[in-house]
């Protein structure tokens, strides 16, 4: 049986957590941030958890994560 391929786009965007979930970067932070308040930019700084309903599809996309 051939090896399963990892979706490279998903591998770049998501990281697996210790408990089997996934985390990702906050959206709306790439560019044109001058009009955002400092508070808004600060809250977008960290990582977010992926919803449980989306975890199954990420496991299929990244079989070796």
Curated annotation (Swiss-Prot):
Q: Which InterPro entries does the UniProt record give?
A: Ribosomal_bL35, Ribosomal_bL35-like, Ribosomal_bL35_CS, Ribosomal_bL35_sf
| Keyword set, alphabetical order | Ribonucleoprotein, Ribosomal protein
Q: Which residues cross the membrane?
A: none
GO BP terms: namely: translation
Domain of life here? Bacteria
Gene3D superfamilies recorded for this chain? 4.10.410.60
Gene Ontology CC annotation, any one: cytosolic large ribosomal subunit
- Region of interest (Disordered), ranges: 1-22
Query: Which GO terms label this protein's molecular function in UniProt?
Result: structural constituent of ribosome
Q: Which Pfam families match?
A: Ribosomal_L35p
Per the similarity annotation, which family is this? Belongs to the bacterial ribosomal protein bL35 family.
Name recorded for this polypeptide: Large ribosomal subunit protein bL35
**What phylogenetic lineage does the species belong to?**
Bacteria, Pseudomonadati, Pseudomonadota, Gammaproteobacteria, Thiotrichales
């Amino acid at each position: 049986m051939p090896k399963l391929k990892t979706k490279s786009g998903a591998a770049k965007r998501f990281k697996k957590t210790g408990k089997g979930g996934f985390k990702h970067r906050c959206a709306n932070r790439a560019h044109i941030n001058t009009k955002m308040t400092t508070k808004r930019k600060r809250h977008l700084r960290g990582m977010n958890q992926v919803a449980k309903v989306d975890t199954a599809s990420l496991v299929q996309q990244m079989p070796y994560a």
